[in-house]
Each structure stands twice: as structure tokens, then as C-alpha cells.
Amino acid sequence: MAKDKIHPIVVQALENEQWTITNDPLYVEYDTDESAFEIDLGAEKLIAAEKGNQRIAVEIKTFAGSISNQFHSALGQYLDYKAALSNSEDDHDRKLYIALPEEAYNKLNSIRFFRQRIQQYELKFIVVDLESQKIVKWIE
């Protein structure tokens, strides 16, 4: 699977926030190899002791080109990956996020149809400032 152009920037942004990349890509098998997925990143971060370990999986998207086509593709992948993760012995506890540039998130958020789908499917985002290579928002 080809890595998006912003892949190294997202990796750096996560590392800047003390995330340790554990799998790049994260391989999740559902039933067989035919239904296996590669998710761009697996990362885990130790949170305060009372919260335990927080584990995430991150799909990286640039949202270049048609925003409608890119959203449709990202939504389909997100739903498939979420189902695969929930059935995985090793990775069922990972929270799934879509990492995307701040500009792309702002554009999605400005269109009512996309806002409604984001709420409907409870999408989670990591919004990244590409210039500073920093995470500007975690959308839960």
C-alpha cells in the first residue's frame, strides 16, 4: 500500500507528542489473508498510571483532489479497519484515527454533509499542521 505524502510528517508529529511507533504499517487480519488490512501506523503512548496504556491505529489521508471522493474512500476504509480491529485478538483495544492536514479537516468541517457523516459514524481525527509538523487537534 502506497504511503501518503504526509506520512513522515504525521510520524514526526506523533513522535513530537511522545508516541512510540510500534508498527508501520499495522497489519490486521480479519478472517484470512484475503480479508487482511494494512493500517498506516500503530502507535502506543503511556498515559498516567490510573489510565493505563492508550493504543491507537492511524490511517493517514491527504484529502488531495476531490474532497467528496477522498471522504468516501476514507470513510469506507475507516469502517472496514474499525471492524477488523474490533475482531483482532492483538489490536481490539486500539482507537482508530484518520490523520489529515489541518486545511483538509477545516474544509470537511465547513460542509454540512461531511459534518453529519463524521457525527453519524463517530469518526476520530488527528489534525496535523504540516508546516510545524505538530498535532493541532485530536477530534474524538
Where are these regions (language model features)?
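Nuclease catalytic cores
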Residues: 2-11, 19
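Basic, low-complexity intrinsically disordered segments
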Residues: 55-57, 65, 109, 113
